[in-house]
Amino acid sequence: MMLMTLVDEIKNRSSHVDAAIDELLPVTRPEELYKASRYLVDAGGKRLRPAVLILAAEAVGSNLRSVLPAAVAVELVHNFTLIHDDIMDRDDIRRGMPAVHVKWGEAGAILAGDTLYSKAFEILSKVENEPVRVLKCMDVLSKTCTEICEGQWLDMDFETRKKVTESEYLEMVEKKTSVLYAAAAKIGALLGGASDEVAEALSEYGRLIGIGFQMYDDVLDMTAPEEVLGKVRGSDLMEGKYTLIVINAFEKGVKLDIFGKGEATLEETEAAVRTLTECGSLDYVKNLAISYIEEGKEKLDVLRDCPEKTLLLQIADYMISREY
C-alpha cells in the first residue's frame, strides 16, 4: 500500500479538527459574532499547528481523538491572533479574502478575536486527561498568549524605529510566531503522557521550526507569485517592515527606495528583489532558516522511530520548501 504524502496525512488529521471545531464552536446567538469568529477558521489555512500537536501526542503513544480539543484550542488561538494582527497592521486581505474587520468592522473583529481567545481555554479545559497535565497545558497556552502579545508589541515598535538589529528581530519572531508551534508540540507531548524532558525537547522543536517558518515566510513575500501569496508581492518592503532580509541588507549599507513607500510599481519591486538577491541578504536568510530547521529536527532524537516522528521531520522540511 502506497504511503500517504505529508499533505494527505495533515489533511486527514485536519478533517477531524474541522469536525471538532463544528462541535466545540457552533454558530449560536448572537449569530453574527460567531460567524465573524468562524470566518477565518472556516477559510482554511494549513492547520500546521494542530497537526504538530496531534503528531507529538501520537509520537509519544497517545491517539488523535484524545487530544482533539487541545488541537482545536491551538487553532483558535492562532486565528485570534490573525484577526487582531490584521486590525493593527491595517491588512485588509487575509487568505485571499476580505479580513474580518473589513466585513464586520474593527469593533466586531475585536470581539470575534476575543471570543476565539476565551473559547480556546474553555475548550482546552474539556480535554479528558490527568488534571495536573491539563493544568500544565493551560499554563503553557496562557503564557504563550502573553508572549504573542509581547511579540506583536515589539513588531509594532519596530515601525517607529530607524534601526532594528538581528537579535531584536529574532526575539520578536520567537515571541510572535514560534511560541505557538512550541506550545502545540509541548501540549501534545504532555497530553500524550510524555516526561517533562521529552515535552521540553518537543517544545524546542516547535520553537526552532517556527523561527525557520517565519524567516522563510519573509523570503516568500519577496519571491513568490502574487496569485500564490494572496497579496501583493513585496508588501513587507512597501509597508516598511523590518524583516531579517531588510535588516541584513541595511547592515551592508544597501539602499531600498521602496522601503516604507506604501506602494510601488512591479518594476520597482523587481528591482528591489534583485538588489536583495545580489547583496546576498535573501540567501543569508534562506540559509539561516535552514539551520534553524535542522537544529529543530535534532530535538526529535528523544522520540522512538515511528511514522509520526517521520511526519514531524517532514513538517520541519516543509517549512522551508513550501510555495506559500
From Swiss-Prot:
Known pathway: Isoprenoid biosynthesis; geranylgeranyl diphosphate biosynthesis; geranylgeranyl diphosphate from farnesyl diphosphate and isopentenyl diphosphate: step 1/1
Top-level taxon in the UniProt lineage: Archaea
Record carries keyword Transferase: yes
UniProt xrefs under Pfam families: polyprenyl_synt
Chain positions recorded as an all-trans-polyprenyl diphosphate binding sites: 94, 176-177, 214, 231, 241
Catalytic activity: isopentenyl diphosphate + (2E,6E)-farnesyl diphosphate = (2E,6E,10E)-geranylgeranyl diphosphate + diphosphate
GO biological process terms, semicolon-separated: geranylgeranyl diphosphate biosynthetic process
Gene Ontology molecular function terms on file: geranylgeranyl diphosphate synthase activity; metal ion binding
Amino acids binding Mg(2+) 1: 85, 89
Record note on cofactor: Binds 2 Mg(2+) ions per subunit.
Name under which the protein is recorded: Geranylgeranyl diphosphate synthase
